[in-house]
A protein has these predicted regions:
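A detector of single, family-specific signature residues
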Residues: 1-211
């Protein structure tokens, strides 16, 4: 069957496909898994395939391009105006098929495997930084409860925490000193992990022109 345009609504395990002919009439509706979808599109004659840019869309977009299809990704907010009131996965797929044909539609470039790798590295690094910040804030909060105020900023905690642990004149219990020492180790390990990730990110970016 030859189609003018296909819209695909992506799910985690199930995909809904709607194909339109040259008059804009929906002539095919199909619900399938990723494997079934790629098997179906392998021999499909279609001028254009549209999808919303979301998790998994870049992988599927590359797979469809390898089959020889023209594939375009769109931000979800630009597809929303074409969605009908009665929401369903097939109606969403049809809205995608309608939206992808619009001359003023904004498209998202399909990321390469290397670009997705770099994106994943940055996301993990961001989570590690947030965890380290949480440790810093907890250290400052625990010390404040014992009358010790540290200036804001990780560098101040890095510099002053060893001195606090070594200062025998501070009225800190043995239990609390052990806890502080454990938090100090956690903070140092977090920083080392982030610095190592920075090196991996830089190496990945240098080795790939698309990144």
């Amino acid at each position: 069957m030859k189609l003018h345009v296909v819209g695909i609504d992506l799910g985690k395990t199930v995909f809904h496909l709607v194909g339109l002919d040259s008059t804009g009439r929906a002539v095919i509706r199909k619900k399938c898994s990723r494997r079934q979808l790629l098997a179906f599109t392998a021999n499909l004659e279609v001028q254009l395939i549209g999808m919303e840019s979301c998790s998994g869309s870049h992988f599927l977009g590359r797979a469809l391009r390898e089959q020889g299809h023209e594939v375009r990704l769109m931000p979800a907010q630009y597809v929303k105006p074409y969605v009908q009131t009665n929401k369903s996965d097939f109606l969403d797929a049809e809205a995608i098929a309608e939206a992808v044909q619009r001359p003023r539609m904004r498209f998202v470039p399909i990321k390469t495997e290397e670009q997705l790798d770099l994106q994943a590295l940055h996301r993990v690094r961001e989570r590690w930084v947030m965890r380290r910040t949480a440790v810093v804030n907890q250290i400052r909060s625990l010390l404040l409860e014992r009358g010790l105020t540290l200036p804001k900023g990780r560098s101040h905690v890095d510099a002053l925490l060893p001195r606090i642990l070594e200062d025998a004149e501070l009225r800190l219990s043995g239990c609390f000193r052990v806890l502080l020492a454990q938090l100090k180790i956690e903070l140092e390990q977090s920083t080392a992990r982030i610095e190592q990730m920075d090196q991996v990110i830089q190496k990945t970016a240098n080795e790939n022109e698309d990144c």
